[in-house]
Amino acid sequence: MARVKRGVTAHAKHKKVYKITKGFSGRRKNTIRAAKAAADKAGQYAFRDRKRKKRTFRALWIQRLNAAVRPFGMTYSVFINGLSKSGITVDRKVLSDLAINEPAAFQAIAEKAKAALAA
């Protein structure tokens, strides 16, 4: 059986790890042991934060909506209640975008929600 030298495979594996840790600082980018650990941890953070990003953005939309409906004399929860009573099914992302980019359209929606609460 022929002798297999491991240099080519090892170099390829190391190169793969270094590609992931490019941009990291200190030993974490150029020492294989530290780079492997850093790459693993980066993967864990990436996985966790892909889930967390969804929560964070929903919270941001809610904060924006709360701020946007205050001038109409409502809080966020009252506004959402009014929307459900008036049968308006627009999600928070779109409502938040409307509040920022189309204030007139958002005002019309807010007034409909307020009218549904009064009725």
From Swiss-Prot:
Keyword Ribosomal protein: yes
GO BP annotations listed: ribosomal large subunit assembly; translation
Alphabetical UniProt keywords: Ribonucleoprotein, Ribosomal protein, RNA-binding, rRNA-binding
Coiled coil: none
Pfam families: Ribosomal_L20
GO CC, alphabetical: ribonucleoprotein complex; ribosome
GO MF term set: rRNA binding; structural constituent of ribosome
Protein's UniProt keywords contain Ribonucleoprotein: yes
Disulfide bonds: none
InterPro entries: Ribosomal_bL20, RIBOSOMAL_L20_CS, Ribosomal_protein_bL20_C
Domain of life, per lineage: Bacteria
Similarity annotation: Belongs to the bacterial ribosomal protein bL20 family.
Function description: Binds directly to 23S ribosomal RNA and is necessary for the in vitro assembly process of the 50S ribosomal subunit. It is not involved in the protein synthesizing functions of that subunit.
NCBIfam families tied to this protein: rplT_bact
HAMAP family assigned: Ribosomal_bL20
Protein's name in the database: Large ribosomal subunit protein bL20
Organism expressing this protein natively: Nitrobacter hamburgensis (strain DSM 10229 / NCIMB 13809 / X14)
